[in-house]
């Protein structure tokens, strides 16, 4: 019955029923008897569950890594770094001074090798410079 390139139109009865459907719904919507289709709460529940999962992950990470984040690990050298002033003294031998090493009680001794007398007197030794 159908020929190539020829399409039959729907019958007027079918066509008229589809045209009248929106007109029939319009008075129901205006009168308030028309109900909106029910929407399930799946998107809202999904968002709430996702927020709680992210919160749980944050709490687990904070509890697991928290103590390590608050502790600073600093490695201090046992000796101070060697100062390198231009034309100055390089202090490379450090030792802890005791009560017998106080500068007031230090006996006058020979000059440190390599020290030359300055115009205002002998230069202090490395031990004396360290005490200062």
From Swiss-Prot:
GO terms for cellular component: membrane. It comes from the Eukaryota. It is a single-pass membrane protein. Residues 1-28, 99-132 are annotated as: Disordered. The keyword Transit peptide does not apply. Glycans are attached at residue 15. Keywords: Glycoprotein, Membrane, Transmembrane, Transmembrane helix. The chain crosses the membrane at residues 43-63. The keyword Transcription does not apply. It is found in: Membrane. This is Small integral membrane protein 33. It comes from Homo sapiens.
């Amino acid at each position: 019955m159908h020929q190539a390139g020829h399409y039959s139109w729907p019958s007027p009865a079918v066509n008229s029923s589809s045209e009248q459907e929106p007109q029939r719904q319009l008075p129901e919507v205006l009168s308030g008897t028309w109900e909106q289709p029910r929407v399930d709460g799946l998107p809202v529940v999904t968002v709430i569950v996702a927020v709680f999962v992210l919160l749980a992950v944050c709490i687990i990470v904070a509890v697991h890594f928290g103590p390590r984040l608050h502790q600073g690990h600093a490695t201090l050298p046992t000796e101070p770094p060697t100062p390198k002033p231009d034309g100055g003294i390089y202090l490379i031998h450090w030792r802890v001074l005791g009560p017998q090493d106080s500068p007031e009680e230090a006996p006058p001794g020979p000059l440190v090798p390599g020290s030359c007398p300055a115009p205002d007197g002998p230069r202090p030794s490395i031990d004396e410079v360290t005490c200062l």
